[in-house]
Amino acid sequence: MVKASATIPPPTYDVEQELIAAGARVVAGLDEVGRGAWAGPVLVCAAITDGSPPPEGLTDSKRLTPRRRTAMAEQVRSWVRGYAFGQASPAEIDRLGMTEALRLAAHRALDALPVRPDAVIVDGKHDYVGAPWTVRTHVKADLTCVSVAAASVLAKVHRDALMAELDAEYPGYGFATGAGYPSPVHRAALAEHGPTPHHRLSWSYLDRLPRWRHLRVVRDSAVDGQLSLLD
């Protein structure tokens, strides 16, 4: 975990202001978390700000310690104009694939906002949102754009809390500390106990678990949403 540094410029409203100058009335920042996890949902947060100065120290969630991130999330929740979460379950990820699962989660988040945005800023190079919104992709947006930085913090804290709840239900997989991502503890639990109902069964980690490999499913790209067991 990398802490925020005073040498890194704080996020700005530059991209949001460009979109507003181009005609957007409301701009939302989006960030996702959970894309690379073996277990748990992929989650997207959409955040709308009002142009006021952000909480001091706001930055990409990955640059904050867990304690600082939790404190920052409390400040962000009371500061933003609105925010909402959308998620796609492991079963939806298995059925749709990650790109479409991200799109589904993003649309759920945007549809749940109290104010409908005209344009959205997405962290990274790829537009996983699509119509009907105007989408601006921006590399390192979670570090440089105020609304995306806010979404980054809220998304990470919210998903971590969900995974901590799963840890209480399925102890031993390290969900509370590893959030469903690969780790030695997670691998050992999978080898001994197999996947839980919250694991993604279409992912290749199951190929390395001979005892549980029969549970892996594959998605038939020729038949949308069709799953079958791996032979």
UniProtKB/Swiss-Prot annotation:
Cellular location(s): Cytoplasm
Entry keyword RNA-binding: no
GO molecular function terms noted in the UniProt entry: manganese ion binding; RNA binding; RNA-DNA hybrid ribonuclease activity
Keyword vocabulary terms for this entry: Cytoplasm, Endonuclease, Hydrolase, Manganese, Metal-binding, Nuclease
Textual note on the cofactor: Manganese or magnesium. Binds 1 divalent metal ion per monomer in the absence of substrate. May bind a second metal ion after substrate binding.
CDD domains, A to Z: RNase_HII_bacteria_HII_like
Catalytic activity: Endonucleolytic cleavage to 5'-phosphomonoester
One Pfam family linked to the record: RNase_HII
Enzyme Commission code(s) on record: 3.1.26.4
Family designation: Belongs to the RNase HII family.
PANTHER family: RIBONUCLEASE H2 SUBUNIT A, RIBONUCLEASE HII
Summary of the function given for this chain in its UniProt record: Endonuclease that specifically degrades the RNA of RNA-DNA hybrids.
Protein name: Ribonuclease HII
UniProt source species: Thermobifida fusca (strain YX)
Gene it is expressed from: rnhB
